[in-house]
């Protein structure tokens, strides 16, 4: 259920702060969001896949923690990221 290398590279290129940036919160949140969206499609077909659902909840929690960190460090970057990803907050 993971993303392929081309998709990851495209996401990293779009959200990176500088060349070769893979560790910034924006990149990490964007990658987690893509994985979460991919898993949501999986659960429409496989409603009783509880093992993968646990992984999904772990990813959502990790994304929430990264977003809280970014909100505390730089509010404008946080708001820009939320708008770009189309998250509800």
UniProtKB/Swiss-Prot annotation:
GO (cellular component) term, any one = cytosolic small ribosomal subunit
Q: Would you kindly state one Gene Ontology biological process term found in this protein's UniProt entry? A: translation
From the UniProt annotation, give the residues forming the signal peptide. Answer: none
> Which GO molecular function annotation, any one, does this entry have?
structural constituent of ribosome
- Name residues in a coiled coil: none
Q: Which UniProt keywords apply?
A: Ribonucleoprotein, Ribosomal protein, RNA-binding, rRNA-binding
Residues annotated as transmembrane: none
Q: What does this protein do?
A: One of the primary rRNA binding proteins, it binds directly to 16S rRNA where it helps nucleate assembly of the platform of the 30S subunit by binding and bridging several RNA helices of the 16S rRNA.
Q: Which NCBIfam families match?
A: S15_bact
Return the HAMAP family for the record. Answer: Ribosomal_uS15_B
Identify this protein by name: Small ribosomal subunit protein uS15
Q: Could you tell me which species this protein originates from?
A: Vibrio atlanticus (strain LGP32) (Vibrio splendidus (strain Mel32))
């Amino acid at each position: 259920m993971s993303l392929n290398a081309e998709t990851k590279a495209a996401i990293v290129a779009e959200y990176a702060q500088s060349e070769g940036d893979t560790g910034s919160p924006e990149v990490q949140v964007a990658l987690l969001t893509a994985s979460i969206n991919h898993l949501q499609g999986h659960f429409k077909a496989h409603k009783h896949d509880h093992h993968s659902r646990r992984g999904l909840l772990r990813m959502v929690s990790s994304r929430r923690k990264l977003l809280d960190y970014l909100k505390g460090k730089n509010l404008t970057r946080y708001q820009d990221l939320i708008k770009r990803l189309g998250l509800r907050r």
